[in-house]
């Protein structure tokens, strides 16, 4: 697999072109390898354009944390931060 920063560069390229499916595919790979990557989660928030997308993302976040992240306080803080960013975007729609 390419380096995470290279994959993020590709992701932002696709986001800039509004090719969200391609961006999502790359983000899924990044988050599989590094489920705590806040920049990848932030990019994921960028590709969500509706409240329904964002609600789906919240479910996805919960699933990733349940299945892929160890139960440690600082990781829970990361989850709370990402969910807060999603809620902020929902409020702005």
Sequence positions of predicted segments:
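Conserved structural position within tetratricopeptide repeats
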Residues: 31-32, 66
């Amino acid at each position: 697999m390419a380096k995470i920063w290279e994959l993020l560069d590709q992701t932002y390229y696709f986001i800039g072109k509004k090719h969200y499916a391609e961006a999502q595919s790359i983000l899924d790979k990044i988050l599989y390898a590094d489920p705590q990557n806040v920049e990848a989660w932030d990019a994921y928030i960028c590709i969500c354009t509706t409240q329904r997308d964002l609600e789906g993302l919240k479910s996805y976040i919960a699933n990733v944390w349940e299945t892929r992240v160890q139960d440690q306080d600082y990781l829970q803080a990361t989850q709370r931060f990402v969910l807060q960013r999603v809620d902020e975007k929902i409020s702005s729609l």
